[in-house]
């Protein structure tokens, strides 16, 4: 009998606790009074982020649409990742990680530090431009880093880089000179270019417009006044 009584008391306590939770869930008590946005936000429109919070996060903290808010922030182009969580009794915390743009993707999008393409506006002159097929942005970013390391030793940078449909690489330097590397031995060809630049091409940099490295052991050049490439050391 004593055992049954104890069991009934436990059940009653559980029912009361459950009823209390249901009551709190359906009541206007425990309202959200504060939304805390956290993260190093440089490019995002904070007003827009605040509006997203107001749209989804309101009312009873137990019923507020955490999942909806999370999905809305994920759709915002500048946000790479988001975590939305309740902080009882009255606060919802939104932790945001912002994308860091490293290049332009064509004329209307950007590439972040992970090689992801996203559509957003950014007024920052001097960013390199990537041109390639869909799905090649991560590979282009990797190659950009490799090419830049080699070119930097000669004080050169990349203005634009193209990865063609035939998997060939074309690099436009920050001085306007175009370098064609082709689709094989790209790093070897780029190093050969930097050697030629150091010992031969630099002195004509103001006239030089095009260098074709797609030769076995040499290259061809085109000057601004030329109609056709002038071949050098072609084999």
From Swiss-Prot:
Cytoplasmic face of the membrane: 1-6
Transmembrane feature ranges: 7-25
Periplasmic side: 26-235
Record-annotated POTRA domain positions: 30-99
Keyword terms, alphabetized: Cell cycle, Cell division, Cell inner membrane, Cell membrane, Membrane, Transmembrane, Transmembrane helix
Compartments, record wording: Cell inner membrane
Main subcellular location of this protein, as a coarse class: membrane
Biological process per Gene Ontology, one example term: FtsZ-dependent cytokinesis
Membrane topology recorded in Swiss-Prot or TrEMBL: Single-pass type II membrane protein
One cellular component term from this protein's GO annotations in UniProt: plasma membrane
InterPro entries for this protein: Cell_div_FtsQ/DivIB_C, FtsQ, FtsQ_C_sf, POTRA, POTRA_FtsQ_type
Keyword Cell division (UniProt): yes
A Pfam family of this chain: FtsQ_DivIB_C
Protein family (similarity comment): Belongs to the FtsQ/DivIB family. FtsQ subfamily.
Quaternary structure annotation from Swiss-Prot or TrEMBL: Part of a complex composed of FtsB, FtsL and FtsQ.
UniProt xrefs under PANTHER family: CELL DIVISION PROTEIN FTSQ
Main function: Essential cell division protein. May link together the upstream cell division proteins, which are predominantly cytoplasmic, with the downstream cell division proteins, which are predominantly periplasmic. May control correct divisome assembly.
Protein name, per record: Cell division protein FtsQ
Organism in which the protein naturally occurs: Neisseria meningitidis serogroup B (strain ATCC BAA-335 / MC58)
């Amino acid at each position: 009998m004593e055992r049954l009584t104890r069991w009934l008391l436990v059940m009653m306590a559980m029912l009361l606790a459950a009823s209390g939770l249901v009551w709190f869930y359906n009541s206007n008590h425990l309202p959200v009074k504060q939304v805390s946005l956290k993260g190093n936000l440089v490019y995002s429109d904070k007003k827009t982020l605040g509006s997203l919070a107001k749209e989804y996060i309101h009312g009873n903290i137990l019923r507020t649409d955490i999942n909806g808010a999370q999905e809305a922030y994920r759709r915002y182009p500048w946000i790479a990742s988001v975590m939305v969580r309740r902080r009882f009794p009255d606060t919802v915390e939104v932790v945001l990680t912002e994308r860091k743009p490293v290049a332009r993707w064509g004329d209307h999008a950007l590439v972040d530090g992970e090689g992801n393409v996203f559509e957003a506006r950014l007024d920052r002159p001097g960013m390199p431009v990537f041109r390639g097929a869909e799905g090649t942005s991560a590979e282009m970013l990797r190659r950009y880093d490799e090419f830049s390391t080699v070119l930097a030793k000669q004080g050169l940078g990349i203005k634009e880089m193209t990865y063609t449909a035939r998997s060939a690489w074309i690099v436009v330097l920050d001085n306007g000179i175009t370098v064609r590397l082709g689709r094989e031995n790209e790093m070897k060809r780029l190093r050969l270019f930097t050697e030629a630049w150091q010992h031969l091409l630099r002195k004509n940099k103001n006239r030089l417009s095009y260098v074709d490295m797609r030769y076995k052991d040499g290259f061809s050049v085109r000057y601004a006044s030329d109609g056709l490439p002038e071949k050098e050391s072609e084999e």
